[in-house]
Each structure stands twice: as structure tokens, then as C-alpha cells.
Curated annotation (Swiss-Prot):
This is Uncharacterized PIN and TRAM-domain containing protein slr1972. Residues 163-275 form the PINc domain. PANTHER family: AAA FAMILY ATPASE (PTHR11603), MEMBRANE PROTEIN (PTHR11603:SF147). Its cofactor is Mg(2+). Mg(2+) binds at residues 165, 244. It comes from the Bacteria. Pfam families: PIN (PF01850). Transmembrane segments: none annotated. It comes from Synechocystis sp. (strain ATCC 27184 / PCC 6803 / Kazusa).
Amino acid sequence: MLDAVIILLSIFTFAGVGFAVVDLLPDSVQMQISNMEALRWLAAGFMSIIGLAIGLVAQTTYRRLENQIRQTPIETILTRAVGLVIGLLIANLMLAPIFLLPIPGEFSFIKPTLAVFGSVVFAFLGISLADTHGRTFMRLINPNSIETMLLAEGTLKPIPPKVVDTSCIIDGRIEPLLATGFIEGQVLVPQFVLAELQQLADASNDQKRVRGRRGLDILGSIQADFPESIVIHSADYDDIATVDAKLVHLAQEINGILLTNDYNLSKVANLQKVQILNVNDLAQAVRPIYLPGDSLELKIIKQGKEASQGVGYLEDGTMVVVEEGRNYVGSELQVIVTSALQTSAGRMIFAKPPSVLAS
């Protein structure tokens, strides 16, 4: 609608100019024209064509300017406006003495020329300074403005909210992850997850009841320790049957990350293009890597498959097979890693006591 208004306004304006400009012709020329009315309409038609071309250019320029303004952060617009005002004020203050000087009549054009030129130059300098030092200026006013500006420019990405499922709460590892800062942003606990925890806590099955109460205790603990991070989300989807499907739908709806340690839920969510943060994958990624020659403090728990072997376990559950470790069952000793093997069941480390390596 606005595009049509710009074009029509330009056409009618130029047509009116063409219609009226005929009357500005010298009287001697008008006396030679037999049909002034026809000339007026001819001039109006010619000028309307020019008006159409200028209107199209104005409409295109307006749209480009509008898109640029929409994409420009409000902080940038504000700093440029301040720079423009300051530049114009300085221009007027500096040019005021010149306006007071007596200037001969034949040079009277100098004053308006200097006023226009000085205003344009100082306005441009003010905007340039605002672009260069605007962020520093905005930080003095609002310390959080720089982050807002970078987010608007796309330089920084906002932290998406995390949607936590029941298994992740019961697991309990979410608490140290929050404490160490590995999980940033808001953590949403949907109302239907809270209801599922309550159902488990009220279950007749002892194992389910223990899991449900553990989940509620952990949730209460992290809510008390991190009140700004934990948010109970009231969303519920009565038309969706399962809790897993509701979790995926909520994560899609708010463009969030699904926080879980459920393998099947992770696969289903990935198929639906939902970003996943699997706690088990994170634990696997941060497990220490032992290279041949590294030293371990290990307690030998049992004998291995071969007669001379002893077996122990690291804190993360990794099995360590110690050659010549049978005689150390039940005791702790220092062992040296000789090799590591990744199997479908997990990682296995082979080691030997220093005395065996020395011999």
C-alpha cells in the first residue's frame, strides 16, 4: 500500500508541476502557442512519466532503507542519533561567529553555503564517531548494552533453554553439571515431568518409589541452589500421549535443547531435528585418556581370566587388567599403562606393576 502511495504521489506531483510550468513561459512564447490547454496536458503527461520513474526509484530506496533500519540494532540507531545531534550542535556553535561578521551583499550566499556545508560535515563526523566509540558510550550508560548489541548483530548467539527429562533428574548428575557451569541458561522442568516424578514417588513398587523420591529430592535441591536457572514450565499437551513425545514437542516449540540420558529418546529427538545434550555422552567425553606409560593408583579386586592377571576398576567403571597382578588381589598398588582397547562393551586398559616392567 505504501509503495503505491509513494509512486502515485510522485506521478501527481510531477504532473502538477508540468501542468503549471507552462504558465511560467515568457509572454512572447505564450502568444505564439495557439492551444495552451493542450500544451498544459502534454507537459503534465510528460512530467508524469518522469514522476513514475522517480517514484519507482524513491520506492526502491525507501524499501532498502527500511530493511537496513530493521536490521540495525536499536543501540546503533541511538548512538548515531546522539552523534548526529552533537555534530549539528558543534556546527552551529562554530559557525555562529561567522554569521555575525559583516559580509557584503554580493557575497551573501557565503553564509547559507557555510551553514549547509558545516552542518553536513559535522553531522557526518558525529555519526562516524558514534560508530567508532558508540559501544563504549553505551557501556557507560548500560553495562549490558554491548551484549545486547552483539546478539542483535548475530556476533553472539543467545543461550537456548534446556528442557530436562525425568531420567536426567533421577540420575542426579545434573546437579554437579550446574554447579560447575557446564550447563548454561535456563533449565526448564515441564509440569508433565514433575507429574511423572510424583507418580513414581507414589508408586506401589519399591524401586519406582525410591527413584521418584530421589528425583523430587534432587529437583528440590537444585531449585534451592540455582533458583535463577531452574524454571518449572507450565506447558502440557493433552493431545500428546507420552512424556517423551511431549518433551520433543516442547523443545521444538521453544527451540531448546533436550537434556537427557535416555538413549532411545536421544535417537527419536535427533530424527526430529531437536538438539540433544546427553549426559552419558558428556560423561564419556570427559573421561580421562590414559596413554602407554601413564601411572595409575589401582586396587586389585579379583583375578583375571589368565592365571597371572589381576583386575581392578577406575572410578568411572573402566576395567584395568594388570599383568602379574594376581598376587596383589585385595591391595592397592601403582601400575603403569601398557595399552588400551576400545570394545563394544566399553574401554579396557592393560597395565603392569613397575616391578614387572623393570624386570
